[in-house]
Amino acid sequence: MSTLFTNNIASQNGTSIAVQSGHAITGAAGSIVVPKQMIQYEHNFANNTGFSTTSSSMVDVTNFYVDITPKYTNSLLIFECTLDSKTTTAAAYARYRLVDSNNSDTVMHTNTYIGQSNYWAGTSEWLTTSLRTVFVSGTTSTMRLQLQMQLNSGGTFEMNWSGSDQRVLQVTEIAV
């Protein structure tokens, strides 16, 4: 067996390189990276119950986190989740953000928030909220991507829809 050391491989003729039938290019996990392809997927299950707050400053949403150890510092991470909630005051509304709780609650997105819910909704209306954000990982250390929220305009924010409802929080790492 021989070893070929090179920084670039180019086709002598045309724009593609053929691999003979029955042969394959192999490598250790992560050694072959195709831009815009998924590198890894991580998730966490959380019950949509047992969380309420009156806080007008950011607090952790209990069990709404997902852990990931990015393979590359420049890859994109896509975070997604849904939740059901209501407020006890019609004018109240929630704002959400995503932080890395393993890194001093560093905010992971470029704007202040990643979404809102319950704005001028009735006090007995349970609303489903979808949250999604994309950001550059910036590290290969383990991250705990924690959802946080704050309640504006008073009242109480509740996530007590059903103890039998399970939510998926997920993060996908994408090569650039």
Q: For the regions a protein language model found, what residue spans apply to each?
A:
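Glycine-rich, low-complexity segments
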Residues: T3-F51
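Extended, low-complexity regulatory regions
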Residues: F64-V66
